Amino acid sequence: MCPWCRRRWQAWAVRVDTGAGENVVARLGSLRQHQRNGQRSPHKPLLVLLALGRLAAIGSSQLPWSVAESVLAELIAEFGPPSRTGRAQSAAYPFTRLRADGVWVLDRDVAMDLAGPLARSHVTGQLEPSVESALLAQPALIGAAARELVMSNFPETVAPDVLDAVGLDPREVFAAGDLLAWPGGALTGRKRDPGWRLRVLEAWDRQCAFCGYDGQFAGASVAIEAAHVRWFAFGGPDSADNGLALCSLHHKLFDLGMLELNTSLTVVVSARFSARTLAGRAIYDLHGRELSPRPGTARPAVSHISWHTRQVFKGEPLAA
């Protein structure tokens, strides 16, 4: 974040115009996305987050297609669902379609969805002027909007990586979100069950369901987390059949689509995962390992496993 934006962010964080701010955050947080039946479609949110990162860094959200073609495409490939669409094409979809949401403008009138005209006409996009002006006037809104977008499209394990990738400091984003809790936003919608985490850890004997790690310090589990199979942001319930106890590493890899469960409750490693060191290559040894929950533990529901396979797992399974 540029020094000017940082100073403005800090100055406005505690005296923001909640009426105007709520409107801007609501506009950026209510993008039209194809999410029928739990389908993930983070393309537009990733473009807005990238624009917010540029606005925080240089004071302008202007994004030439020559930059978006590679940077946005890389974000979609890393954080989006599995797709066979070419990278440039995957970036062209949100770059042109976001105009219909009223928060994005292009400096050339080009057809929807086509990458060719964007390149030939050297098109540049940016946030709609009234949106950009409001964000520059109250930079704390950048963090509030970013938090709304990232938390409604990604789990907590992945959200900081997304923010880092677009040039936003996760600590500042989440601090801004704490100060600015917009009524009706995604973050104030469904309420999480505060007892779910403990029930999941206990059901799996406080050990990683994939590798068996069960470290403790002073009697408390260390780096053992409750993972949603179907993400909470996409209708995943806080229920026993949607939870796994996983170590921090395997939770992260599971949410990034490098690890998967099949319906036989066997661990699957993506062929796109690679490692050279002995420690890294230990991930390969998880492939084909069967889960062995203690008697009475609810197994992950097939419907939740199938969602994760369709919407999160990347690439093909590792060869046996």
Task: Please report, for each region that a protein language model flagged, where it lies by residue.
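Short cysteine-rich clusters marking metal-coordination/redox-active sites
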Residues: 2, 208-211, 247
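Active-site catalytic microenvironments for nucleophilic, acid-base chemistry
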Residues: 54-57, 214, 249
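Mixed-charge, low-complexity interaction segments
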Residues: 2-181, 191, 264-270, 276-278, ...
